[in-house]
């Protein structure tokens, strides 16, 4: 996690959790002079509705205006993680053992950067993924992006 993402998480996690939601994670993407800050919230019992996103957005916006951690123009987006939820922390991988996942690494590992397989588990700081009957131990710090892949049966 970059220093900027850590700073944003430290500011926003208490706001989201103070409103009674789970802070799932954040993404910050810079696009030239304009950026996008995505805040993912969850509620395992009740799910997330548009009203929940609006409520969190208002609070986050107010805190961001006061703290001012982003010096450029940006758009704030608050949403549920959805069915293809991104994974940000090792605990989230543990919670989705047996689920299909798409992982993109920062650098190639064993000749590839993209892995599509099943989460087998977490061993220390490694995510164990099975791809075509081959088991990979992917260092968590090397993962650039990971999303659950919904399976419709």
From Swiss-Prot:
Xref: Pfam families: DUF150_C (PF17384), RimP_N (PF02576)
Family annotation (InterPro entries): Ribosome_maturation_RimP, RimP_C, RimP_C_sf, RimP_N, RimP_N_sf
The UniProt record lists the keyword Transmembrane: no
GO BP term, pick one: translation
Chief location category: cytoplasm
Protein purpose: Required for maturation of 30S ribosomal subunits.
The family this protein is said to belong to: Belongs to the RimP family.
Record-linked PANTHER family: RIBOSOME MATURATION FACTOR RIMP
Official protein name in the record: Ribosome maturation factor RimP
